[in-house]
Amino acid sequence: MPSLKDLKNRIASVKATQKITKAMKMVAAAKLRRAQEAAEAARPYSQRMAAVLANIAQAVGADDSAPRLMTGTGRDDTHLVIVCTAERGLCGGFNSQIARFARDHVRKLLAQGKTVKIICVGKKGFDMLRRDFASLIIDRVDLREVKKIGFENADRIGHKVIELFDKGEFDVCTLFYSEFKSVISQIPTAQQLIPASAGEVAAAEGEGASAIYEYEPEAGAILSDLIPRNISVQIFRALLENVAGEMGAKMSAMDNATRNAGEMIDKLTLSYNRQRQAQITKELIEIISGAEAL
């Protein structure tokens, strides 16, 4: 049984931890508001760009003027998987959900005899995936020093992906990230970037993608410029969604930790009081016994 001093020290330690988790919850809540605003602001632009891309792709079809980023290589032998997670932990199961979702996809591809290459955006996803797929990871994007995610961060990743595609390094590229729904709900999501699937995008964007436009210059030339930018835009949106999801998960995790610390303090305080009461009672009995002996 721990002594009164041990219990007192443990209560003080848990109280100190509770102060830290409470402060982290408040910081995450403040960051969440800004991250949520950024993610929600990026959605209409990325969705509209996807709709315009789908419209132009339908106009071009599969003729010779269609860029390879849209039509693909005609094969699906080699897959590039981009996994976006957080750089830090203490956010519940946020990172593990994305990593598990991507891991299942990679295993499915490997079971089908496909070649898989992985780019990890974020330290936590890298740490989790390298346990099983160390030989498949070809690059890791480090964003630890980035205080605020900007389009330039996504654009660098997009250029890297297009460079690999132009070199014939892969046939299909899929982006994995967590779509922010609410503080307690972040949905692991997979989005195909290359080849740009006009049919899927059109279905996702609804009737807005079926409007009729006239293009100047011709549609194929517009697609050649629009698809690379769309890749960067979709990656940018994924990064913003991830930041919002991470902050939401962190706020929820720190709230749970703060409440758990409070419950532990109550239990330890009860144990301390009971033991102190027992010790006082014992001392009183000894005093009374001594007095009676006299």
UniProtKB/Swiss-Prot annotation:
The protein's matches in Gene3D superfamilies, at most eight in alphabetical order, are given as: 3.40.1380.10, ATP synthase, gamma subunit, helix hairpin domain
Where is it localised?
Cell inner membrane
Q: What is a GO molecular function of this protein?
A: ATP binding
* TM region(s), chain numbering: none
Q: Name one GO cellular component term.
A: plasma membrane
Q: Which GO terms describe its biological process?
A: proton motive force-driven plasma membrane ATP synthesis
User: PROSITE patterns annotated for this entry?
Assistant: ATPASE_GAMMA (PS00153)
Q: Does the keyword Ion transport apply?
A: yes
* Membrane topology, record value: Peripheral membrane protein
- Cross-referenced SUPFAM superfamilies: ATP synthase (F1-ATPase), gamma subunit (SSF52943)
Q: Output the superkingdom of the source species.
A: Bacteria
Task: List cystine links.
Answer: none
Q: Which UniProt keywords apply?
A: ATP synthesis, Cell inner membrane, Cell membrane, CF(1), Hydrogen ion transport, Ion transport, Membrane, Transport
Its function, per the record, reads: Produces ATP from ADP in the presence of a proton gradient across the membrane. The gamma chain is believed to be important in regulating ATPase activity and the flow of protons through the CF(0) complex.
Enumerate the NCBIfam families for this protein: ATPsyn_F1gamma (TIGR01146), PRK05621.1-4 (NF004146)
Which HAMAP family would you find in this protein's record? ATP_synth_gamma_bact
The text of the family note is: Belongs to the ATPase gamma chain family.
Query: What does the subunit section of this Swiss-Prot or TrEMBL entry state?
Result: F-type ATPases have 2 components, CF(1) - the catalytic core - and CF(0) - the membrane proton channel. CF(1) has five subunits: alpha(3), beta(3), gamma(1), delta(1), epsilon(1). CF(0) has three main subunits: a, b and c.
Name the UniProt record assigns to this protein: ATP synthase gamma chain
Q: Which organism is it from?
A: Rhizobium meliloti (strain 1021) (Ensifer meliloti)
Gene name, per UniProt, is: atpG
